[in-house]
Amino acid sequence: MVRASLLWIASAACLLHAGEPLKWVQTPKKDELREGSKLVLSYLYATQLPAGIAADRARCCYLYPLLTPEGVNVLGDFQPDHLHHRGIFWAWPYVGIGGEDYDVWDLRGLKAANVSHKAEIAAGGKRAILRVDNVWAVNGQRVATLHETYTIHLSADRSRTLEMALTLTALDAPMTLKGSHEAEKSYGGFNVRFAPREQTVIRTEAGVSEKDQDLNPHSWAELEALYNGRRAALRIDNDPSNPGGTPQMTLRHYGFLGVSYPGKTPQRDAVTLEPGKPLTLRYSVRVSDR
């Protein structure tokens, strides 16, 4: 009897920590993931441009918002200090094709567009999968495809884990990716912009980072802060399968974390993709209430 009671208590405790089943709510403009009735995240397919913002800041095809299990949105979009920053997004400030340079980071030259998307629920509602196919185009001509995969897990213990992958393929001509042109910076690749917050703390495997960082390799980075009085954190982990070893990361206390690829070292500051030979990058993200 005692053993049965203990098993019941343990089962009840697990249920308290587990969320309701995940489900997708789809519209022509976005896919929303919900855990029961609670919003988890949205992927925005349609062009986004709030009233009063310059037309050249229009964009699509990124994650925003992303909420913790207790409902704190940690992502920012159209922040006045960097209007081109947009939730969780894949972008490079230098994309070279056919002798021309384009800036996906700052929304100049290359245009992103969605081609298709497929949302699934697996494991009895414990896992959600979103597969997205986007393109980059110049003057209406497609120059690259982007296959994005997002796997989102049911929340547990006040946290939620997501795995994210990009497969980028040049189409008819070689495509060169570089980070920032500034000598001491190398942002470009996988990027996260944070919502307005207070008491920001950034950590890596080396401990608390008191200053902003560029060009330093890190296996993970986390930003914790107070959002309207509620403490939450987002952590990025590099996948060991990614090319290039431990990546350089861009850490900004104004509210930005980025994983730089290919980074900037004396040995390499660019990577060229040959047509039909894809590049795949993988990262995991964990959001948590503190």
Question: Predicted regions span which residues?
Answer:
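Beta-strand-rich N-terminal accessory domains
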Residues: 19-87, 165, 174, 180, ...
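Bacterial N-terminal signal peptides that target proteins for export
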Residues: 1-8
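Acidic (Asp/Glu-rich), glycine- and aromatic
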Residues: 43-46, 54-56, 155-203
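Beta-strand-rich recognition/accessory modules
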Residues: 234-290
